[in-house]
Amino acid sequence: MAKRLWSVFTDDMDHCYLTGSSVVERHHIFESRQGFKKKSEARGFVIPLRPDLHPNGARFVRSMENLQIDRKLKQMAQTYYEENYGSRDDFRQEFGKSYL
């Protein structure tokens, strides 16, 4: 059985958060060798994105606009974290750096 991913930002994991497209990949907002992917899953920092907007996807189009989207998602997640889970220092401890 596939892992059931969830998001603090949407209940609809089957449509792109930004465009509404039904063709999506699940984006872990924080992902790295330090285990941030699992931490993203635990905190609900996963979001459905169209494949060309998914920073880790094979069809990602590297543009300034798309890189800004990735940065904005990281900022949204950090803001949510600070409002619901812990302080900015706690966030840095868990995810390596601040995006705000």
Regions found by a protein language model. Name each.
Residues S21, D52-P55:
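Short Cys/His-rich local motifs and their 1-3 flanking residues in nucleic-acid-associated proteins
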Residues S21-V24, E82:
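Charged, amphipathic alpha-helical interaction segments
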Residues F36-I47, P55-L100:
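Polybasic, low-complexity binding patches
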Residues V23-K37:
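Short recognition patches in nucleic-acid-associated and regulatory proteins
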Residues D12, E25, F45-V46:
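Residues that flank catalytic or metal-binding motifs in active/ligand-binding sites
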Residues M1-H15, K38-A42:
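Short, charged surface segments at domain edges that flank catalytic/cofactor-binding sites
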Residues C16-T19, R50:
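Short cysteine-rich clusters marking metal-coordination/redox-active sites
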Residues W6, G20-S21:
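Intrinsically disordered, low-complexity segments enriched in Ser/Pro/Gly/Ala and basic residues
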